[in-house]
Structure formats: structure tokens, C-alpha cells
Amino acid sequence: MQPDFPQQGKLIPPQSSSSNQRPAALKPPRLVLDNIFAFPPNRETLGGTAYLIVENAVNFLIDCPAWNVTNEQFLRDKGGVSFLLITHRGAMARAREIQETTGCQILIQEQEAYLLPGLDVTGFQYDILTPCGVAIWTPGHSPGSSCLYYNSLGGVLFSGRHLLPNPQGELAPLRTSKTFHWQRQIQSVQSLIDRFTPTTLQFICPGANTGFLRGRGFVDRAYERLAALDLKAQAS
């Protein structure tokens, strides 16, 4: 059963302005696939993109969107949030406020659960079955980096920062100054290739760099693109 939202008065009011200029309108989430919405990049998570899967009985939030009136009202209008999966330690901004407002259950890989003290958190070790599919531990970007596999629409992988589009719009693991363990990240990519097939993985929704997708909002032919990666060259 989905948790009820608190009363309307719990919403964070928009900030007042002493100037005569009207504040710029905040962009609402946009539909990218059938029942999947992408939120605008969140400055508090260094430009991370959060997603909402809207189901009949369960709404599933992947990573934390910017917490403002526009996004809160959008979630209310869609029926609330039952689960929030945090795919890595850099995607948890405002997790407390989101849980307090929506009553959602938070899922996170167990190595990073300690970063959310005082919250109702379910940690998992390798995989955890959810109402929308399977959360999969994919260490490398961070110790507890994970992805969500949504077993609908031909298979959709929400990859967090484990797999991202590069400036050419091509999907790849990207090594950054924040990468925890590059070799483990490469191994985790290989584990996804071994786990899926062209018929079970059609799309990937990355957790950042979505501007490089040139408005598409997702990566199609997902398994084909994964299998074509030269992981040996990237590992060297």
C-alpha cells in the first residue's frame, strides 16, 4: 500500500522576493519512456538526473531530484512515492526531506547506508528484488554504486553514474576524480553484459550527463551498445 502524503501545509513554500521581477518558472519532470519521467538536473547532486517510474500500485523514485515546490507537487499529482533507490553516495541530497514528506522506503547498497543516519533505510548486499524489478550492486564509481533493472518496456536499466553518455552521446563507464575503484567499475560493467541479453535490455536511463543525449532522454539499443564497449582498452 502506498504511504499517504502529509497535509498540503507540509509543502515547502516558494521563497519570497523583494524585487518586482517574477521568479523564473521551474521546469517540471518530462516523460521519456511510456511511464518513466526524468527530473531536471539537480545542482545539489552535481547535475544528477533522477527518475520516477509510475505504476498502478507503486511509484518508484530513482535518486533524489531537486526538492522544490514544482517537484513535490508533481509527485503528489502522480500519487506519491513508495520507494526511493539511491544509486550512489552522491545522489542522496534531501533524502531526509523526501522521506519525511512522502513516507517512502529508502533502498541503498549496504556500504553506503551509514550515510543516512536516522532514516528508515533498507540496505542490500548484492541484489534486492523490488516491485519494479531488481536493484543490482555495481561497485566502482562508489563503494555502494548500484543500478535498477526495470523489467518492463523490454528492459530498462537506470545506471546512476555507473554508465554515462560522453560528449559524443556514446554510453561508457567514465573515470572521474570521484571514482572509487576503476577496475571494479569495469568489472561491474562486464557483469551487466553477462547478466543481460539483447532481448532483456532495450534502454538505459543514465543518472547524469543527460544533456549529451540531445533531448532523447534515454539510450536505446542498450545491450548492443554495452556489448560493443572495449573494456580491456578502458581498463588499461
Roles of regions detected by a PLM:
Residues 2-21, 28, 59-61, 134-137, ...:
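Metallo-beta-lactamase
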Residues 23-72, 148-162:
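Conserved beta-strand hairpin/beta-sheet module of binuclear metal-dependent hydrolase folds
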Residues 37-42, 60-65, 82-86, 134-138, ...:
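Short, flexible loop segments at the rims of nucleotide/cofactor-binding pockets, characterized by
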Residues 38, 86, 108, 122-123, ...:
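Structural signal for conserved beta-strand scaffold positions within catalytic alpha/beta enzyme cores
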Residues 50, 71-75, 167-172:
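A short, polar/proline- and glycine-enriched secondary-structure boundary/capping micro-motif
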Residues 66-132, 221-230:
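Active-site HxH/HxHxD metal-binding segment of metal-dependent hydrolases
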